[in-house]
Regions:
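The DNA-recognition helices of helix-turn-helix-type DNA-binding domains
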Residues: 42, 53, 68, 79-82
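Hydrophobic side chains within well-formed alpha-helices
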Residues: 16, 71-72
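A short, Lys/Arg-rich alpha-helix, primarily the initiator
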Residues: 5-30, 77
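Short, charged recognition helix plus adjacent turn
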Residues: 76-107
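Short, basic-rich loop-to-helix N-cap that marks the start of a DNA-contacting helix
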Residues: 53-66
Length: 107
């Protein structure tokens, strides 16, 4: 089943904001204000990401990757896992009603 990891996982994947808040910023000695200036975005944008109220977009992933020597894919991968989890759990019953299309028969 394609969604097996979503069904078997006991908790929501870690939001990239939590990674920034708990690991990256303390290690770098950065505050929200300093990070906002470094990234060229508003403090509100940074705060909303750190408090998991805003997703990491492709633009923000590039900014974070540049600032911390990582890749945009790393940040987007974290966000994608959260997005898939949230959507799956919010709409699981709806998705269960969708019938699978049978595989084509071999010629």
């Amino acid at each position: 089943m394609a969604n097996n990891w979503l069904n078997n996982r006991k908790r929501r994947p870690t939001h990239p904001g939590e990674v920034l808040r708990e690991d990256v910023l303390p290690a770098a000695g950065l505050t929200q204000d300093k990070l906002a200036k470094l990234l060229g975005v508003s403090r509100r944008t940074v705060s909303e990401i750190l408090h998991e109220r805003r997703p990491v977009t492709t633009d923000m992933a590039h900014r974070l990757a540049r600032a911390f020597g990582t890749s945009p894919e790393m940040w987007l991968g974290l966000q994608q896992d959260v997005d898939l989890w949230d959507t799956h759990h919010a709409r699981r019953k709806e998705y269960e009603k969708i019938k699978r299309v049978p595989a084509p028969k071999a010629a």
